[in-house]
Amino acid sequence: MSRKARDPIVLPQGVEVSIQNDEISVKGPKGSLTQVLAKEVEIAVKGNEVFVTPAAHVVDRPGRIQGLYWALIANMVKGVHTGFEKRLEMIGVGFRAAVQGSLLDLSIGVSHPTKMPIPTGLEVSVEKNTLISIKGINKQLVGEFATCVRAKRPPEPYKGKGIRYENEYVRRKAGKAAKTGKK
């Protein structure tokens, strides 16, 4: 049994959970999210708590799927209540970003313009031309888009130039050592 899923998910004030057929929907002040449920879990809502238990017919390691759905529902509750945010910083001469309508325009030292469509449900803002903030209620969508932006120019280990998560540690390498020795 999953250790986290032993505890119920406590619903904050203003968040509602409803279960219909094989689908759970969570509504809150920031929006609503839905998730299709597997047949291996049973969800029960009692007051302001949500309980995730394995179904009676599951024999083979029920904790795996139980822990997965506990985490998915907990992230949905947190997303519709407070939301999620990922921040990226661009390091390099001439690196900058701008939001143009529903596109994120990146100048990252390549010969062609790099424009990325912003997925619906996300709010992207740029501060100081080099700090990108990605906000949304769906944790998976926020993380996936942040990873796609970072993958356009990941930080390189010699000078550290590129796009990185805020406060991400980039392991640095030493450059070529000066030649020494006899000729």
From Swiss-Prot:
Report the record's Gene Ontology biological process terms. cytoplasmic translation
PROSITE patterns according to UniProt: RIBOSOMAL_L6_1
Keyword DNA-binding annotated: no
Q: Which Pfam families match?
A: Ribosomal_L6 (PF00347)
Q: Name one GO molecular function term.
A: rRNA binding
Q: Which UniProt keywords apply?
A: Ribonucleoprotein, Ribosomal protein, RNA-binding, rRNA-binding
Which InterPro entries does the annotation name? Ribosomal_uL6-like, Ribosomal_uL6-like_a/b-dom_sf, Ribosomal_uL6_a/b-dom, Ribosomal_uL6_bac-type, Ribosomal_uL6_CS
Which Gene3D superfamilies is this protein grouped with? Ribosomal protein L6, alpha-beta domain
Q: Its GO CC terms? A: cytosolic large ribosomal subunit
**What does the sequence similarity comment in the record state about its family?**
Belongs to the universal ribosomal protein uL6 family.
Spell out the subunit comment: Part of the 50S ribosomal subunit.
**HAMAP family hit by this protein:** Ribosomal_uL6_B (MF_01365_B)
Task of the protein: This protein binds to the 23S rRNA, and is important in its secondary structure. It is located near the subunit interface in the base of the L7/L12 stalk, and near the tRNA binding site of the peptidyltransferase center.
Q: What is this protein called?
A: Large ribosomal subunit protein uL6
Q: Which organism is it from?
A: Chlamydia trachomatis serovar A (strain ATCC VR-571B / DSM 19440 / HAR-13)
Lineage, please?
Bacteria, Pseudomonadati, Chlamydiota, Chlamydiia, Chlamydiales
